[in-house]
Regions:
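Single conserved hydrophobic/aromatic residue that forms the stacking wall/gate
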Residues: 1-8, 12, 184-185
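Gly/Ser/Thr-rich phosphate-binding loop
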Residues: 18-87, 98, 132
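Active-site glycine-centered loops adjacent to acidic/histidine catalytic or metal-binding residues
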Residues: 40, 67, 91, 154, ...
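Conserved ATP-binding/catalytic segment of the ANL
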Residues: 110, 119-180
Length: 186
């Protein structure tokens, strides 16, 4: 008999599974799961609790990752068995990654308990180098909003312990009846 010790899911697969109800997962022995990954969109609190309780049995480490295709790999995430997860938080930057939070005036917010636009201070080995046949667009999209910083397009919160929570896109906003909505709210 072989047992899985880790599994990962994006928000849509998790929502589909959760919509089936708890009865769908009860017949399965998931006790071998030690690590559960979450990717794609930031996970909301209720989904995190469900994933933790129903799939992870309250014992699996939940690894909430933040990355983009353009970053070439995971940038912010807790490390299973090393750093504790916090519901809805990607938590800490991986070694060598130096995120920062910028305010709407282009100033870096250096204190904890901060909210603003997520940027990355310095290059890292897997960073995208350009957009095919459109290097000017690459520079405009990722490096023009905040001087000498990679602009992710995401908002974030940094809590009192320096953990990062991704709050959603700041550059994909819909205005509905006078309310600004990020796609994470829809």
């Amino acid at each position: 008999t072989h047992c899985l010790s880790s599994a990962a899911s994006d928000v849509y697969k998790r929502q589909t599974l959760e919509a089936q109800g708890d009865e769908y997962v009860k017949p399965y022995n998931l006790s071998s799961l030690r690590v559960l990954g979450t990717v794609g969109e930031p996970i909301n609190y209720d989904a995190w609790v469900w994933y933790n309780e129903k799939i992870g049995g309250k014992t699996a480490n939940i690894v909430d990752t933040w990355w983009q295709t353009e970053t070439g790999g995971i940038m912010i995430s807790n490390l299973a068995g090393i750093s504790r997860s916090k519901p809805t938080y990607a938590t800490f930057p991986l070694p060598g990654i130096q995120p920062c939070i910028m305010d709407e005036n282009g100033n870096e917010i250096t204190s904890n308990n901060a909210e603003g636009s997520l940027c990355i201070k310095y290059p890292w080995p897997s960073i995208a180098r350009s957009i095919y046949n459109d290097h000017d667009r690459f520079k405009s999209v990722y490096f023009s909003s905040f001087k000498n910083k990679y602009f992710t397009g995401d908002g974030c919160i940094r809590d009192e312990k320096g953990r990062y929570k991704i709050t959603g896109r700041v550059d994909d906003i819909l205005i509905v009846s006078g309310h600004n909505l990020s796609l994470i709210h829809i």
